[in-house]
């Protein structure tokens, strides 16, 4: 692209009402909810405390203290002959008011959850409180927090306090009366009301002489806890975005996830080191939490089973747990956990990216195909009505993966999965020039479409059943290089929002074959939203997704774009492209034929484009249109928690310039627009 400022160049868009490309399955508007970094824990899930069930190493063995950064890895001893003050304390917990009369043990003999508790020995009574705490919390003013702790107490402990502290001192407390029976774990729940906002720490401290075992502890905003722990404010953004399907629990995480550990009482569920991401999984968000959340939001669940380290029997049992009647073996267990009626989960995936050598349970294509057939048979025996997706790859790489898998599972599964991301700049030695990155990303949907078409052709060629498989494009997005990203989080710009909108337009063009697609992932890492415990920030990618998903109609139409083009040089994993249209457009038509939406991405960083919109095979007498426009203060604008008016979607009614049945419309530079129009009967 040439940086010519403030020019207006001409183009022509032709929308063919009489050339449908296919009916758009609403499940192309999906996203991934994976247990990865702070997508769920620290994002969707309202728990504020890390390592709340005290699994893992003590502080003396961690090279990386901090919230969710150590990823479960043991480090070298810091001191071979001297214990540090945090020895025996599970990281990231720290001692509060330590003395030589306070002793910490990660106790593997007496525990409540999993195989470990946190023990605090107060060897002598004094007037001070001693115990454990962790920092890194963000607290809101005048907010109630529900605190819950599971304790076993021995000896003369006369007072237990759970409190918040900040730079000014105490910021709310709950004085717990430890009246449980001696020798047993007892669960206590109370409320802490904060007085100030800002960074804070949480402390659990006791006074007296004796011993405390802390089996589990929790701190959650009261409004979030009342909603079941998964945040309603993020849920509202999910609904508003036009999303229709949530894929869970992964992603790579699924290849080492054991669903039976994620049911039953929260504090009893064990913590496991998930090998996919080397992160401790507390199992607080399990089957009930996810499926109830989907039900509450009106989302279809898409559940990925563990074909990496899991068994056929576990997968079949999971189907029965979700879908079986309450008098079936696993239906009775479900009912015992509080859910009498089945959820009737229809969409299931037979693993995730098992072709990758990074994946737990990685195998060759023929072995996976056999494994997929075994899983499919067992799961269909539990519920013959379910829809199954097998793991595919792009084109026919990795030992002819798609060829061998498609030919083996043909007719036994319903869909083949494809994953493909734009850019993946980790192969670059340094951050590329701004214009090169702009070109690669705004044109990225074109390279995506080429990969998808090539992949579909290969799968179809080796599929022997009469009915061709559906394609589930169930991971896509923009891989930003975190070496240059602030806070180990991708910084998505308006440029990336145009990529997101353009990718959905390409998926709509392939609606005859793609039945599901899932952007990765919704919150924080690779997310459409940024979220901390008290705030949400809409990225331009969220706005680009919402623009298309919330305002498109049901049938994709053949649409042509004639006008100025540009070439790209290629960048990272993006190939060089020639003659990429500045205007990318697709029309969609309502099922009754009464309404049309024309969505248009102007990829030009600097210039507006004056387009003539020709409606072929029909007409509109409209003189005004409802316009939804994504734009920003500049081409590289982005929102922050404190300033969310740098990019936006503006909705307005606008008069149209109609000349001889052709609509003229000026699409601003670096924008994405949807025009909603009535169609003449």
Which sequence ranges carry the predicted segments?
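Extracellular and organelle-lumenal recognition/adhesion modules and their flexible linkers in secreted
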Residues: 2-283, 300, 310, 316, ...
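Aromatic/acidic polysaccharide-binding cleft in carbohydrate-active enzymes
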Residues: 27, 35-36, 468-584, 593-594
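Solvent-exposed strand-to-loop "edge" motifs in beta-rich extracellular domains
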Residues: 150-155, 193-195, 550, 601-603, ...
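Noncatalytic carbohydrate-binding groove/subsite architecture in carbohydrate-active enzymes
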Residues: 194, 200-204, 208-211, 364-503, ...
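An active-site-proximal structural segment forming one wall of the substrate-binding cleft
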Residues: 199-201, 222-243, 290, 311-350, ...
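Active-site groove signature of glycoside hydrolases
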Residues: 205-207, 249-250, 329-363, 419-427, ...
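The substrate-binding groove and active-site-proximal loops of carbohydrate-active enzymes
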Residues: 218-227, 269-283, 300-309, 351-369, ...
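C-terminal beta-sandwich/jelly-roll accessory domains of carbohydrate-active enzymes
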Residues: 567-580, 601-681
């Amino acid at each position: 692209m040439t940086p010519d400022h403030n020019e207006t160049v001409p183009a022509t868009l032709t929308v063919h009402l009489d050339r449908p490309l296919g009916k758009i399955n609403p499940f192309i508007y999906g996203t991934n909810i994976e247990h990865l970094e702070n997508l769920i824990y620290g994002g969707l899930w309202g728990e504020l405390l890390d390592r709340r069930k005290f699994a893992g190493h003590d502080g003396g063995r961690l090279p990386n203290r901090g919230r969710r950064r150590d990823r479960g890895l043991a480090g070298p001893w810091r001191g071979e002959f001297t214990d540090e003050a945090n020895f025996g304390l599970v990281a990231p917990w720290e001692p509060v008011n330590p003395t030589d009369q306070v002793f910490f043990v990660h106790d593997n003999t007496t525990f409540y959850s999993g195989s470990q508790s946190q023990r605090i020995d107060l060897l002598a009574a004094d007037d001070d409180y001693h115990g454990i705490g962790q920092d890194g919390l963000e607290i809101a003013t005048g907010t109630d927090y529900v605190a819950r702790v599971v304790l076993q107490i021995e000896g003369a402990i006369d007072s237990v306090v759970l409190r918040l502290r900040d730079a000014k001192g105490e910021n709310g407390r709950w004085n717990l009366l430890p009246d449980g029976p001696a020798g047993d774990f007892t669960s206590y729940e109370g409320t802490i009301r904060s007085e100030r906002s800002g960074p804070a720490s949480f402390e659990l401290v006791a006074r007296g002489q004796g011993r405390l075992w802390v089996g589990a502890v929790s701190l959650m905003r009261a409004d979030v806890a009342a909603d079941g722990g998964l945040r309603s404010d993020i849920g509202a953004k999910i609904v508003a975005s036009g999303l229709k399907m949530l894929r869970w629990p992964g992603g790579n995480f699924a290849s080492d996830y054991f669903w039976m550990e994620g049911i039953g009482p929260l504090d009893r569920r064990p913590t496991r080191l998930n090998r996919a991401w080397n992160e401790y999984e507390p199992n607080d968000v399990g089957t009930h939490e996810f499926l109830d959340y989907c039900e509450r939001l009106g989302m279809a669940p898409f559940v990925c089973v563990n074909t990496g380290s899991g068994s056929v029997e576990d997968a079949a049992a999971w189907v029965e747990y979700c879908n079986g009647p309450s008098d079936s073996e696993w239906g009775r267990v479900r009912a015992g956990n509080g859910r009498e009626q089945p959820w009737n989960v229809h969409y299931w995936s037979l693993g995730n990216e098992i072709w990758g050598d990074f994946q737990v349970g990685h195998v060759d294509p023929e072995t996976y195909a056999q494994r997929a057939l075994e899983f499919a048979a067992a799961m269909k025996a539990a519920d013959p009505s379910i829809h199954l997706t097998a793991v595919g790859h792009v084109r026919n790489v990795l030992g002819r993966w798609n060829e061998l898998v498609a030919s083996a599972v043909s007719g036994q599964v319903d869909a083949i999965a494809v994953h493909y991301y734009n850019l993946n700049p980790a192969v670059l030695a340094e951050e590329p020039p701004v214009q090169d990155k702009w070109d690669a990303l705004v044109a990225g949907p074109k390279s995506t479409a080429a990969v998808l078409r090539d992949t579909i052709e290969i799968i179809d060629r080796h599929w022997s059943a009469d009915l061709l498989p559906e394609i589930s494009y169930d991971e896509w997005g923009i891989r930003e290089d975190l070496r240059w990203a602030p806070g180990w989080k991708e910084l998505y710009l308006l440029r990336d929002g145009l990529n997101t909108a353009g990718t959905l337009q390409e998926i709509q063009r392939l609606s005859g074959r793609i039945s599901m697609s899932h952007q990765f992932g919704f919150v924080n890492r690779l997310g459409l939203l940024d979220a901390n415990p008290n705030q949400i920030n809409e990225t331009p990618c969220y706005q680009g997704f919402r623009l298309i998903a919330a305002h498109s109609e049901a049938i994709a139409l053949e649409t042509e774009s004639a006008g100025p083009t540009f070439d790209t040089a290629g960048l990272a994993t993006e190939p060089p492209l020639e003659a990429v249209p500045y205007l990318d457009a697709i029309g969609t038509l309502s099922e009754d034929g009464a309404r049309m939406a024309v969505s248009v991405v102007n990829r030009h960083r600097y210039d507006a484009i004056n387009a003539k919109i020709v409606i072929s095979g029909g007409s509109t007498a409209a003189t005004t249109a409802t316009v939804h426009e994504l734009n920003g203060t500049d081409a590289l604008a982005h929102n922050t928690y404190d300033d969310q008016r740098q990019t936006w979607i503006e909705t307005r009614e606008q008069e149209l310039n109609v000349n001889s049945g052709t609509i003229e419309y000026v699409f601003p530079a670096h924008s994405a627009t949807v025009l909603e129009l009535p169609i003449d009967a």
